[in-house]
Amino acid sequence: MLILTRRVGETLMIGDEVTVTVLGVKGNQVRIGVNAPKEVSVHREEIYQRIQSEKSGSPSEGGNF
């Protein structure tokens, strides 16, 4: 795992087309902005896991959504 330190307003690049910008820090929460092409899916981890479990036909952990 690559670990980077960024300040508010600073950006990192993933490949040539994806940028991740630190928008703000408040307590233990960090707000980030992600710019990516439409063909690149961007999800929070828990949403991605729910999508994957729905694709495989497994019931989701949290009940109905």
Swiss-Prot record:
The record's keywords, sorted A to Z, are: Activator, Cytoplasm, Repressor, RNA-binding, Translation regulation
Q: Which GO terms describe its molecular function?
A: mRNA 5'-UTR binding
* The keyword Cell division belongs to this UniProt entry's keyword annotation: no
Cellular location of this protein?
A: Cytoplasm
PANTHER family (UniProt xref): CARBON STORAGE REGULATOR
Spell out the subunit comment: Homodimer; the beta-strands of each monomer intercalate to form a hydrophobic core, while the alpha-helices form wings that extend away from the core.
Q: What is the protein's given name?
A: Translational regulator CsrA
Which gene specifies this protein's sequence? csrA
